[in-house]
Every structure is written in structure tokens, then in C-alpha cells.
């Protein structure tokens, strides 16, 4: 076949495809040859497998496809399949009368491209040329991959060699250049740090710069960068220490300020003795005068159990004990300051009206004051201070006649002037006030016919004397308060030199004293007592409607 004929065959493909048929059965071999020729294939036949192998070895490039029987006497078809695939790399189609899947699987595993059953049909042979085309494409792909992989391997090897050469050159350059070597790390020892501190102290913290510090330290292998880094850390630590010192100083100042104010307990309006009293609502006011110093007394909180002694206004020219920082409201619960309105307002309250003087309540509650004489200046700008009278020890046996009508004794609470304001120019208390225990009496008139008309009993009713009367006064002046719910604070009794004591007794002591005097005295003719037939016994006192409880 000439070159031109081969080109024509290739152009007319699959016409003229070269096929080698191998089968030990001559009948089957003749039928297979006839069918292949009808498909216009170029056919070569043989009945021995060994002969077919020799033909293939002699003519490697003269066959395109091999069709071989499975069962042959001289050589198994699968053996021929392996040899052809290894040596010539041609597509092989297996032909057999066994349709067992085991044979088909075995042929596929050994490299067969197809498995045909006898008798073979012409329709199956018409499309066998596709295996030739597929095989040729696989060969081209393998060749391209092999060429590409070879080129890639060469390129990778070349790049790797170049990279290794460059690294070797860089290592050589690093070894040759001493400046390119890594600088050793500086360890700031205690000695080195002391030199640094000495240099900073010599230059000053503000003027210390790394270059000057380095010159003063004069240490080998110490660079300017090392000194600059250490100086920055030193300044940060110094700033932190200074900030902590400032905070501690501020905290100490605040603590000392509160230590000076530690005596200001209770309500905020009652200040220490060295502070001025602010003028405003809810405060004792007296202009710019100082509030006298009171010693702390735990009995002050016992409002309803203390003896309700008279408050005597005194001058503020008494000596002050500056070491005592007590507060008159120390330890006083807020609940005890709230006096119930239903207990007849027994404790007259102070008010906070501006420019109004302090008042001296005189709710005696069958009690009498300690004999003492006092006087107040009539200057309205003067702010008097209050002292608590001495604990009462006995009841008065003498009654002083008063001008109070019997009908007024049992009048309603609203008609009684328990509290009243007075003008700031007027004196606080009548200067002719007689504080003799005998002058303070109790005139009740229990036998009055008006007693059945009211449900409230007032233990004491006193009449106010005219201002120009020089006689003894039996009723303390009362001034009305704008806050009737505010309770009266009771505390210490007066001692010599204006000092205060804290031995005020409770109402239990008073009642016991009353019972003792009742048993020891048999004549009550001097007092105006009328108990409507009741015996003077303990049951009589239980009938008295005190504004507060007699129990402790």
C-alpha cells in the first residue's frame, strides 16, 4: 500500500480499518471474517494465539484492532490480551460463547475494551471502530502529559536549584557583613540600672536624653536604642508612682475631713460646735452665732420615757469643751422623732421661722423644775441656747391659785395655745419668771361638770400672767409652731458652770417617787385634788390620761 493509499484510507476512516481476528474454531473464524469485510474493514485471520502474537510483534504498526477468542488450545485469550496490551498497546475485543459475568469481569480487568458473545452480529461490528479512536486519543493525552510533566519537572528542578544557590549566596553575604548580624540582647542588671539612675539624676528627669545618658554611662555594647527604650519605661513607671502618691494624698485629705465631721450624726442641720448654724427650714437659727456644744447622751433617744423637765434659756457665755464632739441627735432613730398627733401634742416643737427666737416649752406634765434663776437679754439678735433642766425628784405639795376657769380646763386641744410665735423684738420668756418648785403647781379640778363633755384630759393647765405683773408666774409662755408634728427633744440637766449631765431619769422613776410620796403623805389639803371619790392609790394614777405611756 502506497503512501497515497494510506492517506485515502485515513480520510475514509473507518473504512479500511486493519483488524486481526484470532479463533481456533474455523467456522466461527470464517463467519467473523465475512462480517468484518462487509463493514469494509481490512481483515487478517489466524487460528492460533501464538501465531497472532508473532504477527503483531513483526508488524507493530500494521494493525489497528485485535479480536480474540477466550478459549484457545495453545494460549488462553486473557494471556494474549495481557501481552498485546503490554507490548503493542492496541485495543483488544474478547469473543466468547460464555456469558458468565465472571468472564466479562476478568476480561475488563485485563484490559479488554469490549466483550462480545457468539454468534456475533454485524450491528455490533459496525461500531468497533470507536475503540480505535478512543485508544488513539488516550495515547495522545499520555504523550502530552508525559511531555508536560517532563518539562514541569525540569522547570521545578531548575527553580529549586536557583533558590538553593540564592540562599547560599545570601548566607555568604551575611557572614561577610558584620553589620547584618543580629544585635545581642541587652540585659539590664542591677548595676547597669544604678548607672542609668545616676546619669538621670545628674542630668535631671526633664533634661535626660538617651544620647547624654549613654555618654555618662560609658558602657560597652550599649546602644542609644537600648537607653531610649529603658528611659521610656522608667518615665512610665515614675508617672505611675506619682499618680498613686497623689491619689493617696487626696484620699488622706478626704479621710481627715470626714474625721472632723464624725460628730455630725443624726440630722444634717445640727453641726459641730465650731461651725455656724445655717438659717433655713428645719434648723435652729440664731444668725451667725455658734451653737453650744452638747455632749453625747444615749438617753436622748428615750423621748417618751424621760422626765419632761423644763427647758431653761441661758446665756451662751459658758465654757465650751472642744474635745467633746457629741451631737444632740446622736443615736436618735427617725421613728422616735415622729410624735403622734393623737397624743395631744404633749411636746411643743421648735420652729424654723427666720428671725424668730427660740422658745422655752413649759409642758410640765405634773412635773416641776429644778429651782434656778435665769435671765435672757431682750436683744432680738441674740441666739439663746437651751439646757435641759434637772431631773424632777418630787411632786409639789402646794398648789398656787390660778385664774383658769373650770370650763377652760377641759377645752379642746385646738383652743389651747400650746405653741405660739412671738415677735423677734420681744423677750423670749418673762424675766420675772419664778422657777421655784412651789410656784409650779397643778390645778386640775377633776370634779368639774365640763369633764364629761370632752374625751381628752389635759394634765396641766396654766394661765399666762400679764407682762407688767411683778408677781410669780405660774404658766410658761408658749409660742405656736408652724410644724406641730415636730417633737420636742429632751436631754441633759444643768450642772454648775453651764455643763451638762446625762443622768435624766425615766418616767418609771418619777412614778415610783410619786407612789412613795403618796404613801408618806397624808394631807393633800394644800393642793386642789378632786378625784371624784376615788382613793389615793395606784389605781388613781391609772385613770390619768397621760399623753404618753408610763411604761419603760
Curated annotation (Swiss-Prot):
Biased composition regions of type Acidic residues, renumbered to the chain: 163-177
Coiled-coil ranges (or none): 151-173
4-aspartylphosphate PTM positions: 69
Placement of sequence motif Nuclear localization signal: 182-185
Gene Ontology biological process terms in this record: callus formation; cellular response to cytokinin stimulus; cytokinin-activated signaling pathway; maintenance of shoot apical meristem identity; primary root development; regulation of anthocyanin metabolic process; regulation of chlorophyll biosynthetic process; regulation of cytokinin-activated signaling pathway
InterPro entries linked: ARR-like, CheY-like_superfamily, Homeodomain-like_sf, Myb_dom, Myb_dom_plants, Response_reg_B-typ_pln, SANT/Myb, Sig_transdc_resp-reg_receiver
Subcellular location as annotated: Nucleus
Gene Ontology CC terms, in alphabetical order: nucleus
PTM remark: Two-component system major event consists of a His-to-Asp phosphorelay between a sensor histidine kinase (HK) and a response regulator (RR). In plants, the His-to-Asp phosphorelay involves an additional intermediate named Histidine-containing phosphotransfer protein (HPt). This multistep phosphorelay consists of a His-Asp-His-Asp sequential transfer of a phosphate group between first a His and an Asp of the HK protein, followed by the transfer to a conserved His of the HPt protein and finally the transfer to an Asp in the receiver domain of the RR protein.
UniProt xrefs under CDD domains: REC_typeB_ARR-like
Chain ranges of the Response regulatory domain: 18-133
DNA-binding region: 185-235
PANTHER family: TWO-COMPONENT RESPONSE REGULATOR, TWO-COMPONENT RESPONSE REGULATOR ARR10
NCBIfam families according to UniProt: myb_SHAQKYF
Function as written in the Swiss-Prot or TrEMBL entry: Transcriptional activator that binds specifically to the DNA sequence 5'-[AG]GATT-3'. Functions as a response regulator involved in His-to-Asp phosphorelay signal transduction system. Phosphorylation of the Asp residue in the receiver domain activates the ability of the protein to promote the transcription of target genes. Could directly activate some type-A response regulators in response to cytokinins.
Recorded family membership: Belongs to the ARR family. Type-B subfamily.
Name of the protein described by the UniProt record: Two-component response regulator ARR10
Organism: Arabidopsis thaliana
